[in-house]
């Protein structure tokens, strides 16, 4: 009986460590106009992802209802591995699933997926504005 417990324990720990070592992502950094950002490289897809990259100052306080203002530069490395917050709104559709970091008026973020093996020439760019009629949705939702 004791050997069964030992085998179960051994299997549990070995499964955990095998899963931890099989993580296909590793960090990648790139310099943009405002500073350095760090995203992930996915070995399975060959894509670099940068999620929640700010593109303007937060539209709060004196900046509320104003045109977007240029982003201030930062020092150090900004981690961009999670979707930014979604706009303040209700999830009106029952099948909505958001992967964002909560809700906020500060929701001016981009998500970038780029091939890691790209040449130095320009690549086609797709800009996608998700639906929702200004009442629902965000860039982290899987349907978009």
Regions found by a protein language model. Give the residues of each.
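Bacterial Sec-dependent N-terminal signal peptides
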Residues: 1-25
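Non-catalytic accessory segments of hydrolases
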Residues: 21-144
């Amino acid at each position: 009986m004791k050997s069964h417990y030992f085998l179960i324990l051994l299997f549990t720990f070995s499964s955990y460590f095998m899963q931890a070592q099989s993580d296909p992502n590793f960090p990648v950094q790139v310099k943009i106009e405002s500073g350095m950002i760090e995203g992930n490289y996915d070995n399975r897809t060959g894509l670099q992802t940068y999620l929640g990259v700010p593109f303007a100052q937060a539209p709060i306080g004196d900046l509320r209802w104003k045109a977007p203002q240029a982003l201030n530069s930062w020092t150090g490395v900004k981690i961009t591995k999670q979707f930014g917050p979604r706009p303040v709104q209700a999830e009106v559709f029952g099948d909505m699933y958001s992967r964002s970091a909560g809700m906020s008026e500060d929701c001016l973020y981009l998500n970038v997926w780029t091939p890691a093996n790209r040449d130095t020439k320009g690549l086609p760019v797709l800009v996608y504005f998700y639906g929702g009629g200004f009442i629902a949705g965000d860039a982290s939702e899987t349907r978009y």
